[in-house]
Swiss-Prot record:
<keyword id="KW-1277">Toxin-antitoxin system</keyword>
<comment type="function">
    <text>Possibly the antitoxin component of a type II toxin-antitoxin (TA) system. Its cognate toxin is VapC16 (Potential).</text>
</comment>
<protein>
    <recommendedName>
        <fullName>Putative antitoxin VapB16</fullName>
    </recommendedName>
</protein>
<comment type="similarity">
    <text>Belongs to the UPF0330 family.</text>
</comment>
<dbReference type="InterPro" id="IPR003847">
    <property type="entry name" value="Put_antitoxin"/>
</dbReference>
<dbReference type="Pfam" id="PF02697">
    <property type="entry name" value="VAPB_antitox"/>
</dbReference>
Length: 73
C-alpha cells in the first residue's frame, strides 16, 4: 500500500464520487477502468469503417489530448 497526496479540491471531488463503503482506491480504479473502456469502445465503433489514414488521424488527436506529468528528481 502507498500513500499519495492530493489537493483539497481533488479530495473533495473523490469523496463525492465514493459509492457506499467504497475506498478512495476503489474510486480511482473505477475511474481508470472506465476511461480504458471508453477508449476501447471508440476503437470498436470505428473498426473496419475507417481508412488507415483516418484512423491514424484519430489516434494522433487522442494522443495530443493525453497529458503526461513530469516529476523532478
Amino acid at each position: 500500500m502507498k500513500n499519495i497526496m492530493v489537493r483539497d479540491e481533488v479530495y473533495e471531488k473523490l469523496q463525492k464520487m465514493k459509492k457506499g463503503r467504497e475506498s478512495f482506491s476503489d474510486v480511482i480504479l473505477r475511474l481508470i477502468e472506465g476511461r480504458k473502456k471508453r477508449g476501447i469502445e471508440i476503437l470498436e465503433r470505428y473498426a473496419g469503417s475507417l481508412s488507415d489514414s483516418e484512423l491514424e488521424k484519430i489516434v494522433m488527436e487522442e494522443r495530443r489530448k493525453f497529458r503526461v506529468r513530469s516529476f523532478d528528481s
